[in-house]
Amino acid sequence: MASDYFDIAIALAGVCQAAKLVQQFAHNGEADLNALETSLYSLLQTEPENIAAVYRGSLANIKLGLETLIEQLNAMDTELARYWLGILALSGKLTKSADAKNALASRMQYLPAQLEHYGLCSDMTFEKMATIYTDIISPLGKKIHVIGSSLYLQQPSMHNRIRACLLAGIRSAILWQQVGGTKWQILFSRRKILKAAKHIYETI
């Protein structure tokens, strides 16, 4: 198997992990903490040494994403598929917009310093990341419609959490493009991606 399918599977797992976190927040008001910290951490990695470094140095940190990717490639959950495929679509729009890419790079450059005095999962962190998503990513294309419990979705703080996770999904989607990922592969090379994802999952 070509090694690039492993990198493609890893990046897609990052996208799927972000999508799963969105679903967890929307339905339960809380999410897998390790997966959440990993996804948010990925946003601060602009020059990683390798692909694992994006996810806190270990692929075990995207276990939730690998599980979700494997499930999705076997039999798609329509709600979840709308999230991760929507993230891929928005990332495609982003790469075609020089203005949006420059704006995103500029905002992300200052994010580590802005968050220096706050925890990775603090309300301020969620708010900063959500604002970047709202200002730059959301206007690029069709909005991702999130469904869940009105008890949680009516809370502004939950909106911030969900948008921060969507921004993390965009980070992994950009990585997916960088390692050679394409939508055609999802249609025609699904088995290769699935095989790679299963192999990675079994080794973590």
Swiss-Prot record:
Primary localization: cytoplasm
Location of the protein in the cell: Cytoplasm; Cell inner membrane
Gene3D superfamilies xrefs: HflD-like (1.10.3890.10)
Entry keyword annotation includes Cytoplasm: yes
HAMAP family: HflD_protein
Name of the protein this chain belongs to: High frequency lysogenization protein HflD homolog
Presence of keyword Secreted: no
Keywords carried by this UniProt record: Cell inner membrane, Cell membrane, Cytoplasm, Membrane
Family affiliation: Belongs to the HflD family.
GO cellular component, one term: cytoplasm
Pfam families per the UniProt record, alphabetical: DUF489
NCBIfam families with a match to the protein in the record: PRK00218.1-2, PRK00218.1-4
Membrane topology, record value: Peripheral membrane protein
InterPro entries for the chain: HflD (IPR007451), HflD-like_sf (IPR035932)
